[in-house]
Each structure stands twice: as C-alpha cells, then as structure tokens.
C-alpha cells in the first residue's frame, strides 16, 4: 500500500509539532525560572555537573528535539510539495533558490555567528555593559546589507531570470522573495544573540511558529496553484517563504524585548567590532555563495550537454538536490543542534585560554560524532531503496541516497570541525578553504556531468566534502591537540552497523515499491536495537580487556 500524503496530514503534523515543541519550551522556561528563584534565596541546584555543562546539554537536547520535530515535518512537507507540483516544479524552485540564496547570503552572511561570538566573549570577560552596543552595531550592519540585497533582487529579477537562470518563469518568484531579506537579516541578529547568552529556547519557539505557519500557508497555496502550472506553483512557494520570514521577525523581536526589558548598558553602536568579525565571514560567504550559485546554474546546462532535455535536467536536479540530499542531511539535525552550541563554548574557553578544556571538549565532540555518523551512513545505505519509495515514491531518489550515504561520516565531521574552528576564531582560514572548495566544485561539475550525468554531481559532492574536511581537520589539529579512539569511534560502530544491516535484510522481507511507512519504521527500529546491543557488548568486552591489560602491566 503506497503512502499518500494529504494536505490535512501535513497541517496536522505541523500542529502536533508546534504543540510538542511548545511543551518542551515551556518546561525549560519553568525550570529556568525555578532555578533563578532558588538562586536569589542564596541556594544552588547541584546535579553533579557544572552549570555550563548542564546548560549545554539542556540546550542541546532542546534543539535536538526541536530539530528532529522540524526536520521530520519538513521532510513530509517536501514530499507533499514534490508530489503536488512535480519534479520539474521542484527543479524550477531550486534554481530560483540559487539566486535567492546568494541574496540571503549577502544580506545575512556572518552576522548571526558574529553576534554569538562577540556576545559570548563579552559575557566570558565580564563586559555585560558592551552587549547593547554590539547589538546596535549588528542591527545597523544587517539593515544596510539586507536593504541593498532586497532592492537589487527586486529590480533585477527579470535580468537574473533571463540571463543567469535561462528561465524567465523564475522572475516572478524572485520579486516575491525580495521583501523577505530585511526581516531575515534581523532574525539572524537576534538568533545569534540568544545563542550567545545560551537561551536557545527563544529561538526554538520562533522556529516552531515560523515553520508551522509556513507549512499551513504553503500547503493551501500550492494545493490551489498546482493546476495552474509550474510557474504559479513556484510563486506560491516563494510567497509562503516571504510571509513566514515576516511572521518570524515579529515573534523573535517580541521575545527580544521581553528578554532585554530592564537591562542597562552603554549607548551607541559598536559597528567596528561587528564589522571586524563579520567582514571576513561575509567575504567568504559572498564568494562561496557566488561560486555555489554558478555551480547550481550550470548543472542543468551541463545535463543538457549530457543529452537531457530542459525538463529532464530540472527533474534530475530536483530529485538529487531536492529529495536525496535532504534525506542525507536529515540525521544531521542532532549534530547541528550541539555543534551550533560548540561555538560559544569554544569562544569562552579560548578567551580564558583554557587549552585543556578545549581539548576535552573536542575529543568528546569528535568521538560522539563519529559513532553517530557511521550509524547514520549505514542506515541510509541499507534502507535507501525503501526511503526513496516511501517518502518520495521515486526509485531514482533511493539510488541517489545510496550513492551519497558513503560521504555521511565525512560530511558530519566537517560540520562539527567547522563549528569548532569558528569558535576559536579561525573563520579566515575557513573562508579560504570554502572558496577553494567551491572553485574545485565548479570545475568537477563542468567536467563530470557531461560524462556521467547527474551522478557526476554526486561524485563532486563526495570529493569536495573530503577535501574540505581534510584541510579543516589539519588546521584544527594545529590549534588543539586532541586524540580520537579509532577502535571505539570508528571500527566498532562500523562493525555493529554492518551486523545490524545484515540481520535486517535477512529477517525482513523487502516489499520494494509496496513498502509501508510502518514496515519501514519497524525495520529501522530493529536495526537500531541490534546496533545498540552489539555496540554496547563490544565496548564492554573492549573495556574489560583494557582493564585486565592495565592490571597485568601494573603487577610487573
């Protein structure tokens, strides 16, 4: 029985998602208020861990729960959109987003991370009074760049569509997206502030409201616009995005006012400090996004050289980039939650010159990431065919998921490495790595796609992730001396994942196109249980052997 995704199902999922995350948010807010009341009376809550560690894991768990909820709803939402407007419609909206993505980068590049880093450093050094000046400078910086980006995108939409995208149907969507850039840049400022003060619950509720609103509005718009053609469908997707950003800005600004009420600090705007950090990040992002835009523009063109028609090229590109890649990135939501919190943690330790603390945190982060990434890669590869059929009803999507599964460990590790480098102030180095990465990507896309088709793009993704991670890791190892237990973090997880995958394929009968969501869920749960049991068993044996060896060595 095929899995049919209806508009009512999507809207109901978004409502459940909103309720679930609001509950987590309110629970965390209650806990924080209770802690503040107790501390005011001269008491302390002690749970056997430092306050920073507890806050880090509280925030990480909150963001993980939020991220999984959002990504799950988003996955089914994207599947609904794909089935409603078709692969060609997804392809058109994807190429529209290449130009829009560059505009977003120009409007917001580096500002969220800049605010996070400056606010975290100021708090770590006891300079709370400088936070208002940092925020004022960041707001001015964001307004200048976002206003310019919005005007250029709106008035240049026709030229971008005709000359750059080679599809005049994209012009209307670009004009609709232009007004979203100003609120989006201001959201980045306030989001960075809340991460910097380690109150990510504020960001969580904003994201929940925004995505719930976007899903409900876009489902309604696309459901009515789909019969009108590909162009109208892309326009409705764009309209949903613009209105959502405006709603999100209103919500997060209201939360900011509540957070800062009664706060005092120096007047004026410290735009110089903001620009010093944001400029290198911005330049890196501008150049990389420009190169990324070029890359995504030439992909459909090189596919036509391979022999595909315009519609076939957009469909193939939409399947790989709009279906397979989101599935590959789905498990990374957990890592993204914690890796985003690593930036202020490393920034504070860097300011305090706590090298031992940075080393311990890096070792924990990389060891955990490796175990999780190896498991994710194995599950994506083993269930690639079923995921393609169940979520997207597409055999090609399953093929691309299997092809990209091999790069998952490198991709996830690179994500964590990048966050650590930004936390210790290595954003300029990351800038040059990202620029060379993008240049090589364009070269490989130009070279491989006419020979291999869309699989050439998959090969390009794998090669460039490996390149980026290698250079980033070399730099990080020069700054922080840390070690990773390869047996416990790579060999044992890989062996356990292979065992779980082998047993699942042996014990469960593959239904191919007829696989149901419930059957797939049971397979994945079974595989996770086998992995957990086998990995835990291997680790117990390994730890026991190490203890015996140490005792034996000590006896001599």
Describe the predicted segments one by one:
Residues 59-74, 240-252, 256, 268-344:
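Transmembrane helical elements of multi-pass membrane transporters/channels
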Residues 70, 78, 109-116, 176-195, ...:
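Short runs within selected transmembrane alpha-helices of multi-pass transporters and secretion channels
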Residues 36-52, 230-238, 253-286, 353-356, ...:
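Interhelical loop/hinge segments that connect adjacent transmembrane helices in multipass membrane
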Residues 38-39, 55-116, 141-143, 150, ...:
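Signature of the first transmembrane helix
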Residues 109-124, 328-353, 359-362, 366:
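Helix-loop junctions and terminal segments of transmembrane helices
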Residues 233, 284-285, 488-546, 556:
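Transmembrane alpha-helical segments of multi-pass transport proteins
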Residues 2, 6-73, 129, 133, ...:
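N-terminal membrane topogenesis motif
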Residues 136-163, 220, 359-410, 442-443:
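Alpha-helical transmembrane segments of multi-pass membrane transport and lipid-handling proteins
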């Amino acid at each position: 029985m095929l899995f049919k995704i209806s508009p009512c199902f999507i809207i109901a999922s978004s409502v459940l998602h909103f309720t679930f995350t609001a509950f987590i948010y309110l629970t965390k807010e209650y806990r924080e208020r209770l802690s503040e009341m107790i501390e005011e009376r001269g008491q302390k809550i002690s749970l056997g861990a430092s306050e920073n560690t507890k806050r880090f894991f509280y925030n990480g768990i909150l963001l993980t729960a939020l991220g999984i909820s959002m990504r799950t709803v988003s996955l089914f939402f994207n599947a609904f959109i794909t089935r409603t407007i078709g692969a060609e419609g997804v392809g058109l909206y994807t190429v529209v987003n290449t130009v829009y993505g560059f505009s977003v980068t120009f409007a917001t590049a580096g500002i969220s991370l800049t605010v996070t880093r400056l606010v975290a450093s100021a708090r770590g050094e006891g300079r709370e009074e400088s936070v208002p000046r940092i925020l004022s400078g960041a707001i001015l910086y964001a307004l200048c760049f976002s206003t310019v980006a919005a005007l250029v995108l709106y008035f240049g939409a026709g030229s971008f569509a005709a000359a750059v995208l080679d599809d005049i149907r994209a012009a209307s969507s670009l004009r609709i997206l232009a007004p979203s850039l100003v609120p989006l840049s201001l959201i980045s400022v306030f989001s960075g502030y809340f991460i910097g003060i380690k109150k990510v619950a504020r960001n969580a509720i904003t994201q929940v409201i925004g995505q719930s609103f976007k899903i409900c509005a876009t489902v309604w718009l696309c459901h009515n616009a789909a019969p009108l053609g590909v162009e109208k469908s892309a326009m409705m997707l764009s309209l949903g995005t613009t209105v959502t950003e405006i709603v999100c800005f209103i919500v997060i600004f209201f939360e900011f006012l509540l957070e800062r009420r009664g706060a005092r600090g120096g007047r004026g705007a410290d735009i110089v400090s903001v620009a010093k950090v944001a400029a290198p990040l911005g330049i890196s992002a501008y150049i990389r996004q420009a190169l990324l835009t070029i890359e995504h523009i030439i992909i459909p063109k090189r596919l036509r050289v391979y022999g595909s028609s315009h519609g076939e090229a957009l469909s193939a590109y939409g399947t790989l980039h709009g279906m397979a890649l989101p599935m590959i990135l789905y498990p990374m939501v957990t890592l993204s939650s914690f890796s985003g919190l690593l930036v202020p943690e490393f920034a504070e330790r860097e300011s305090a010159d706590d090298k031992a603390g940075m080393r311990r945190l890096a070792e924990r982060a990389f060891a955990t990431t490796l175990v999780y990434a190896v498991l994710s890669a194995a599950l994506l590869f083993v269930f690639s065919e079923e995921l393609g059929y169940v979520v997207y009803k597409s055999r090609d999507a399953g093929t691309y998921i299997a092809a990209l599964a091999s790069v998952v460990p490198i991709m996830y590790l690179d994500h964590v490495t990048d966050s650590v480098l930004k936390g210790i102030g290595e954003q300029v180095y990351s800038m040059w790595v990202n620029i060379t990465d993008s240049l090589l990507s364009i070269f490989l896309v130009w070279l491989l796609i006419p020979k291999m088709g869309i699989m050439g793009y998959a090969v390009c993704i794998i090669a460039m992730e490996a390149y980026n991670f290698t250079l980033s890791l070399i730099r990080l190892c020069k700054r922080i001396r840390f070690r990773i237990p390869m047996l416990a973090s790579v060999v044992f997880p890989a062996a356990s994942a292979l065992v779980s995958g082998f047993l699942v394929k042996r014990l469960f009968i593959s239904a191919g196109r007829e696989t149901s969501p419930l059957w797939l869920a049971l397979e994945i749960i079974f595989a996770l249980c086998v992995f957990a049991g086998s990995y835990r068993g291997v680790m117990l044996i390994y730890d026991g052997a190490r203890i015996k060896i140490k005792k034996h060595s000590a006896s001599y």
